[in-house]
Structures are given as C-alpha cells and as structure tokens.
Amino acid sequence: MSEKILLIDGHSILNRAFYGLPDLTNAEGRHTGAVYGFLNIMFRIMEEEKPEYLTVAFDLSAPTFRHKRYEAYKGTRKPMPEELREQVPLIKEMLAAMGINIMSLEGYEADDLLGTVARRSEAKGMDVTILSGDRDLLQLATDKVLIRLPKTVRGKTTIENYHTAEVLEKYQVTPPQIIELKALMGDSSDNIPGIPGVGEKTATKMIVQFGSIENAHEHLEEVKPNKAKESLREHYDMAQLSKELATINTDSPLEFSYEKAKVENPYTPEAYELCKRLEFKNMLNRFDPVTAADSSMELEFFTCNDLSGVEALFEKAARKEQVGISVLADPDQVYTVGLVLDEKEIYQIPVGGLLTGDYLCGKLKALADSTVLCAMDIKAVLKHVPLEEPEKVFDTGVAAYLLNPLKSSYTYDDIAREYLDGMMLPAKEDLLGKTSLKKAWEEEMECLGNYACYQAFVPCMARGVLLEKLDETGMRKVYDEIELPLVFTLDSMEKWGISVKGEELKSYGEKLKVRIQELEKTIWQEAGEEFNINSPKQLGVILFEKLGLPGGKKTKTGYSTAADILDKLAADHAIVKDILEYRQLTKLKSTYADGLGNVIGKDGRIHSTFNQTITATGRISSTDPNLQNIPVRMELGRLIRKVFVPEEGFVFLDADYSQIELRVLAHMSGDEKLIQAYREAEDIHRLTASQVFHVPLDEVTPLQRRNAKAVNFGIVYGISSFGLSQDLSITRKEAAAYIEKYFETYPKIKGFLDGLVKEGREHGYVTTMFGRRRPVPELKSSNFMQRSFGERVAMNSPIQGTAADIIKIAMNHVYERMKKEGLHSRLVLQVHDELLIETKKEEIEIVSRILEEEMKGAADLAVELEVDMHQGDSWYEAK
C-alpha cells in the first residue's frame, strides 16, 4: 500500500474557518475562532486520511513572481481583517507545538509549494491529498492526487472530493484545463483579468471544443458566439497573461524534507497547554492523561495524617505571614484539607481517625488569628470554616476576576499559568476526571490529595502578584472594600436561604396548569385544528401558511417563531398574543412551579448560590435556582412571589433603589438639567417627554411618557435607533429623532457617552466610578456588528457597573450593621437593585432605618439615591 502525504493550504483553510464559524475569543480577549476551526478540519482530515506525512503551506507577505509579471495581481483583494491576521502566528505556533511541518518560500505562493510537493510525491509513488478552500488547486488533481475542498456553513463543515473524474464530471474539463478556463473568464478574487465578455459558461464551451486558448486562437473563425471570437482576437495577449498567472508552479525551488514532514503524535504536552491557554476545552479530550500529566510542573507534596504531626504543622503555619488552604468537601462531609506554607512545604491532610473534619476546620479557624489564609474560593471555605474577618483572608478567584472579568472560570491551573510565570499545572479534570470527591476519598486518595495541594499552592504563591496587579490597575480598593467583604455577605445569604411554602407552590402550579390548558384550547380554536404548540415547525406552518400571517421567515428547518418575530404580530393577531402567553406560562410552570419544588431543603428553605465572578459588569448573579429571573411583568408571573414567605415572627422588608442607573448617569455625565430634575424631585420620564416632544409638562400623554421612559433607560444601555424602533414599534427615522432630541435636551450626556467609547478605544477598557475595569476588546474589531456591540458595552458598562458597585456596598453595610447591632433580622435576597430582608417584627423600625441610611449612603452622588421600601408577609406583598 502506498504511503500518503497530506498537504494543507494554511491561509485558505484558516480563512474558511474564520468566515464559516462564529467569532470566538478567549478570556484574554484574543480571537481564536479561526484557529479552532482550522484544527477541527485538520483533525478530521487526518483521521480520515491517516497520512504518513503532513505539511502546511503558508503565503508570505513579500511579492511573488506573479506580482512582478502583473503589478495588479490580487490588487482588488481587501486587507485581511485584524481578527484574522492576529490568528496567523497563533496557528503557526500551534502547528509547531504539534510538531507539524510548515513551509513557505519568498517569491512563491502557498499554491506553488503545494503543487511542487504534490508532483514530487506523486513521482515517488505516494498518494497525495491536498486540503484547500481554493478551487484553483483543482488543476493539480490526478488519479493519485486528491483535492479536498471544505465548506463551512453555520458551523457545519462538508467536504467535496476531486480526482480527475470528479473534476471532469462537474466542470466538463480536465484538471489542467481549469487553467484554460481561468485564462478566458479571469478570476476576480485574484484580479486575473481574463478577456472581456467571456463568463464561465462561454469559457467552458470554448475549452470543451478547442481544448486550450492556443487552439481556440488558431481556429478563431470557428469560435462562437461572435462576441467571444472578437474578444479573443482583440485580447489574446491578456488571455495568455491570465493563463500564466493562473498556472500553479509545480517546480518551485523548494527545499523540502520528508523526514521533517513525517507525522508523529501531534497531541504533545506543548500543544495541550496551548489548547488550554486558548480555552479549546473540547479539544483537550484528544490528549491522553499521560500527555496532560507530562505537560505539568512537578511539585513535591507531603501527607500529614497523625495528630501530633498536624499540631506541629499548624504551629509552624501560624508563624508564616500567609498560608494557602483548601477544603475539599461536600455539604455535610469534609474529605481532605490542603495546607501550603511555601513552595517547599505543601501538605495534604486527609480526614480519618482523630483527624475529623470538625477538628481540621477548627484548626483553620484558629490559624486565621495569626496569619492570612489564601484560598481559591473563600466562600466555599466559609461553608465549613466559620471565619469572620475579611482582612484575614485572600480570595484568589475574586482577585483574578477583577483583573479579567471576561473569563468564564478562574481555576488554579489558569491562574498559575497567567500569574506564576507560565507555570503549568494539571487541571482538576486531569487529576480526578469525573470522579466525585467522595469516591476519590474512598478509592483515589493520592489524586484527591494532589488536587487539595494544588488548590492551596496557587493561592499562596499568587497572592503577592495579584495584589500588585490590583494596585497597578487601581482596583485594590474595589477588592478590599467591595468584593472581599461581599464574599461574607453572600455566604450569609446562602446559609440562611429563603423560606418557601410548599403547598402554596403546588397551588400556584395548579393555577398555571389550568390557565395553560385554557390557552391550549383557545389557540386550537383560533387555528382551526389541534397541533403541538411547542413545536416551532408545526406552529410556523399554522401561522404563516394556514393563517397567512405576515412576516414569516423560512429557514431550513421551517419558519422562525422566535419571540421577536411573534412580538411584532401580537397586537394585531389574537392567536399570537395567546401563544406568547402560553409560552411564558409553560416556562413559569417548568422553571418555578415544578423546578423550585425540587430544590427546597430539609429546612423548608431554598439556598440559592450567589455568584460574584460571572458577569463582566460586576453584577451579582444567582444560580441553583436563579431567583433573579422571577418575572415581574405578568400578574401570574408576579404571583410566584407569594410562595416566598418569612418564618413565623418575621416579615419581609423590601428595599429597592429608584432609577439608580439614571441617577448614576446624571452624576457621571454632570448634565445640569438632569441633575436639577432629580434635585427637584421631578417625574424624570414626564420631564423628558415634555422636553423631547415639546409639550407642556401637564399635557404629556401616557404614551409620550412611556416612550420617554424607553429612551431614558435605552440611553443607559447604549441603545441604537434600530433597537429603540423595535421597542416602541416606530420607524428607525422616528427613533433616531427621539434619540437626537434626547441629547439636545441633556447635552452633556452625548459628550459623556462618546468619551466612554473613546476611552475604551484608547485603553482597551472602561471604568466605573469606583475604579472597576471592564475590558472591551470588541472595539478593535473590523466587523461592524462587533464594533457596534463594543461601543454599546463601552457606554453602558460604567453606568451598570457603578450601579452594581453601589448595591454591593449597600449590601455589605446593611449586613455589617445588622450583625454589629446583634439583630435577628437577615439579608436573604438581592435581585438587581432590590434587597429583601427577613425582619423580626420587633426590629422593623431599626432595620428600616438601617436600610434607609446604608442604601442612601452607599455612594456620594450629585443627586440623592432614592429607596422605595415596603413590607409584607410574603415577597409578593412586600413588593
């Protein structure tokens, strides 16, 4: 069986991947989508072809012999987008890490090198496969040379295969005659001129009849139609030049080594680490565990499992300035503790015998009296170690989040690589795979111990550099005064949870069920038949074919029935309005009526997880379950709040900032008119309507106020005229006029927002009033949509982020005040700009005062922060 060589057209495949796949970036803001797509295509072809040899050809920026022959060659080609350009060295770095041969030659194109190696390999009796997105390479196809052309659409790649027979079947000419076609019809992508008036159809007929441009020219009188004949007569020299430009040089002076092109295992430790850095998580499973382990730095770990040894270790740790800790545990069971004194003293302490979880956690609590405890996730430690002073701990994950809030996770191996001089450590998945902590404790203690050590080692080693970076970026104060205290506030909220009436929840579910069934019958009646309302395909047919509703957009899978499509039809078509309500209620039922019942704890309370390292703007998010997405617009949606109740002897106090983002905008922009309006306690939406629509304040209609409200809040989110037109169901021209009038009304706001975009472009980030940074890599994009998104982010992040900082400060101060004053009341929930306090009835007055003082005093703005406060025996009543 013949040996096989796989030749890849580097720039062509990278280009295909770039335009065929969604834009991807890693946490550093680096564009990676083209590299990811390239590797996926390459791996697929390698698995199918199983070549003994592999090489990738790249063009160089220097002119080639074709440019010297014809100065305008490729002259019309647009510059490579910056997002793609920056990935060229990246793919070369990846290929080098995989040990894959790369070839380039000044004065020649990649096509010439591919053609040269293809012919040399064919002469050696090898089978040759060329992978390219460029059909020019079809001229190289033979029975031994296979041309494979990938096509990527919506992330899905299909591949066309061509030997001689397939070229002949599709194009009616032989592979070498592809050159003749180009000579006549030209190639706009390469600016090969061809001859005027001859397209693909005429060129194909001429070459099928005459075989070559030379033969056609010799039999000029036989050429038809007359237009083509005269064009060939007049422009034959141009046809000859075009043929020369289109011909791939298969004899370029390339020094090529088959030894260097020999395929070894591409899944090297270096490639593994690069995949991790680029966050190609789906590719990591291609690497075997040995490779992953080989890529990692070796550290020496010690096991301490006797009582006297542990006592001595903690005494030694107490004399250190800082130590790294980890607590590997499930909610009701500690399995092992990691303790790191420095880079040489790294210990794991497994639970067992006298070394109980309670004993070890008690030792960690006592240790905080003498030294700073550094951990990856302090909130997770607090579940087992009741620490109380933020200044006694360091949260590595929170610090890393502040420095780069665009990452999706902050693991010890990522932080080691980024902040400890590129140190490579095995990830949790490398050590434990999908094994649970309990099972690892029972069966794989060494792996669990190693994981505990790494979890403690990185925080200990990284604290200094992270604090230095926080100082350099001006975010040390945000870390010390907002984020670190917030860890303790959120931990308290998670531990308390919020009480839920199980019977009320069931009753709510039944109400939803009845209404859903009513809607189902109504929709079927309106449609004239029964169908699956949850099937977009069936729904699309009913709405846009049977009922003939306008606006149907048909895709490969049927009509789109997305919410934005249906929203436009709801006002005029009852069935659409009912379908939208049906969808909302079925989601309510599955997510809340049914879903919440599954997460009620033994204490009758739901203990959600509050995340402070998820959103790029600094807002807190909630998961398991998400209590921040409870609907507020529909009455049936609001009713879900009735199931959340305080325990006996308590009531709910709900405190909500009024228009906090608009007040922040007034302060940060310094717009006197907006500031004055707030100081005079005007209805800001009515005032805006009066100014924008030029009507007296007392003549503003409800519709005008509603539209002004949409503009007010839309400006905060950097809304475009298109977005506003969609929100208000008006034309883009009208929306643009509204926005223009708004900026005329509040002139300093426009300058402020433009300044934010400028700041983002200059620095790569924007900042909140408190100094929190939000990177905006999209501002550098050559893609208009991406760049426009970046501009909106630059405009709204400082406002949203400042509002988020204010609510966090308020939460911390409220939590600390209630604790300091020894109250039984507790903060149980935060939703956007709203705080919910489970308040002991005897403490209502003092808690109300604390909320008022701390929420209003959280920031010193040019306009006063306003707080709306209500109380009730359920969240529904309090809201």
Question: Which residue ranges define each predicted feature?
Answer:
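Function-dense linear segments that define catalytic or interfacial modules
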Residues: 339-343, 403, 409-430, 451-453, ...
